[in-house]
UniProtKB/Swiss-Prot annotation:
GO cellular component entries: nucleus
Subcellular location: Nucleus
Entry superkingdom: Eukaryota
Modified residues (Omega-N-methylarginine): R147
UniProt name for this protein: Arginine/serine-rich protein 1
Single GO BP term: spliceosomal complex assembly
Chain positions found as Phosphoserine: S17, S120, S122, S284
Pfam families the record matches: RSRP
Comp. bias (Basic residues): 37-104, 126-141
Length: 300
């Protein structure tokens, strides 16, 4: 290409050239360049407007963000407060020499200053505190007996073997005060025998039954002792024995036990028609103390 053509091309491309004013073709190209520049400025302004809007929105968001952070902070604070309520009971105990005196220093999780409380050290709680995993609470001691020694807690302190007191107390309570066995006197035994007789007569409906040989021997020995005793007791026992014998005879005469092969249960005989008529006419059966054994029961 020649230098004239190059210069013409450059002048055509340049917007403020004198050839552009002279020639109409150059004026058309200038208008197109102006329109393109205007569209570029408009597009740049349009592009700048959203940027400004986005910047304003971002600024407003940045201004509104602290509010949300405040809310989150308040929520986190409330959660921490709830956690502190539960942490009140978990206190980290500081090791000090005041244990022997019965005092314990422990630091509350809410306050930094240590507080002093007077508490008596209980023997059932271990003196070893667990500081691992952030848990600071009392762990109850367990007894591990090895070679005559007892380890409290996690084996940090060793104590000599000692018997627990509650076992000794239970043994002393279970033992009776008097080491001699409980024995009944002969009088008490005879009273119990009479009560047993009365119960048997009530259950069977008759007082005519044979006693075993051991009880007969006891009755005979009791009669001999009563004869050697004072006269008043002897007379009272004789009257009691006489009334008992009379009542036994009358009961045997009134009610006799009937046994049969068909019926194995002992039942008294049925009453006569005369006795039944007397009972119905009187309305209520009359109990004679001398004839019936029920009037001679001994009160217990």
């Amino acid at each position: 290409m020649s230098s004239a053509a190059v210069s013409k091309y450059v002048n055509d491309m340049w917007p403020g050239s004198p050839q552009e004013k002279a020639s109409p073709s150059t004026s058309g190209s200038g208008r197109s360049s102006r329109l393109s520049s205007r569209s570029r400025s408009r597009s740049s302004s349009r592009s700048s407007r959203p940027h400004s809007r986005s910047s304003s929105r971002s600024s407003s968001r940045s201004h509104s963000r602290p509010r949300r952070s405040r809310r989150s902070r308040s929520r986190s604070r409330s959660r921490r407060r709830h956690q502190r309520k539960y942490r009140r009971y978990s206190r980290s105990y500081s090791r000090s020499r005041s244990r022997s005196r019965g005092h314990r220093y422990y630091r509350d999780s809410r306050y930094e200053q240590p507080r002093r409380y007077y508490q008596s050290p209980s023997p059932y709680r271990s003196r070893s505190r667990s500081r691992s995993r952030g848990r600071s609470h009392h762990r109850r001691s367990y007894y591990a007996i090895t070679r005559g020694r007892r380890y409290y807690g996690f084996g940090r302190t060793v104590y000599p073997e000692d018997r627990p007191r509650w076992r000794e107390r239970s043994r002393t309570r279970s033992r009776s005060r008097s080491r001699t066995p409980f024995r009944l006197s002969e009088k008490d035994r005879m009273e119990l025998l009479e009560i047993a007789k009365a119960n048997a007569a009530k259950a069977l409906g008759t007082a005519n039954f044979d006693l075993p040989a051991s009880l007969r021997a006891k009755e005979a020995s009791q009669g001999a002792v009563s004869c050697s005793g004072p006269k008043t007791e002897h007379s009272e026992k004789q009257t009691e024995v006489g009334t008992k014998n009379a009542s036994e005879k009358s009961a045997a005469a009134q009610r006799n036990i009937a046994f049969s092969s068909n019926n194995s249960v002992a039942k008294p005989l049925e009453k006569t028609t005369k006795a039944a008529v007397e009972e119905t006419s009187s309305g209520s059966p009359k109990i004679d103390k001398k004839k019936s054994p029920y009037g001679l029961w001994i009160p217990v």
